Regions:
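Short, low-complexity, intrinsically disordered N-terminal peptides in bacterial proteins
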Residues: 1-9, 190-197
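Conserved G/P- and acidic residue-centered "switch" motifs that form tight phosphate/ATP-binding loops
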Residues: 16-17, 55, 81, 169
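Acidic/histidine-rich helix-loop elements
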Residues: 24, 49-57, 86-89, 165
């Protein structure tokens, strides 16, 4: 076998909203390029497709799932729900959409990392519990990897957040990538076992 046809890079799709898309940041400073660079620095060859669309809800992500995650995809990072929460959408609707996303990806034997989100305190304890409980429940249901809070390390820190108080700045993205990196490596290991060469 010629050396040129050595193991191809794993293909990941990052399915999300503006937090995945890199809202308000230069092209190379968003989550996807920074994550790909961090993996490359560790000697891990991977191609990450940025399927982040600003403003998308979980239902929007479901509606475009099939064309956002093409054949040959090894793994998907699912980061959806923040816009549902900000709009006060019924957590049941968010859960139903995320459930359908995970079900379809599982049926396709694609490894999944589900990223959780936290509800704003002003939505109340009942909403917060219902919303935040969606993620661990579905991760367990489908055997997906689970990262409890996508914005871990940057949320609430003004020095790591853009002026809107919601989206991470470049430094914030660096923190997010650093914290989620071990879980993404675990995802790639799982993807390799689901797609034996």
């Amino acid at each position: 076998m010629p050396a040129a046809s050595a193991e191809a890079p794993s293909k990941i799709v990052a399915l999300g909203d503006s937090l995945t898309a890199g809202f308000g940041l230069p092209d190379q400073e968003g989550f996807v390029p920074r994550l790909q660079a961090a993996l490359a620095d560790g000697g891990i060859a991977v191609e990450i497709a940025n399927a982040g669309v600003s403003g998308d809800t979980a239902a929007d992500g479901l509606a475009r799932l099939d064309w956002s995650v093409p054949p040959g995809t090894d793994a998907v990072i699912v980061e959806l729900g923040a816009n549902d929460m900000l709009r006060g959408i019924d957590p049941k609707a968010t859960r139903d959409a995320l459930d359908a996303i995970l079900r379809r990806l599982t049926q396709r034997h694609i490894a999944v990392l589900l990223c959780g989100m936290r509800a704003a305190p002003n939505l109340g304890a009942e909403y917060g519990q219902a919303f935040e409980g969606i993620y661990p429940e579905l991760a367990e249901k489908y055997g997906a990897l689970f990262y409890p809070f996508f914005l871990d390390g940057s949320a609430g820190d003004r020095s790591l957040t853009q002026h809107d108080g919601l989206h991470p700045n470049a430094a914030g993205v660096g923190v997010i990538v650093g914290r989620i990196l071990p879980k993404v490596k675990e995802l790639l290991t799982r993807a390799g076992s689901q797609h034996p060469s």
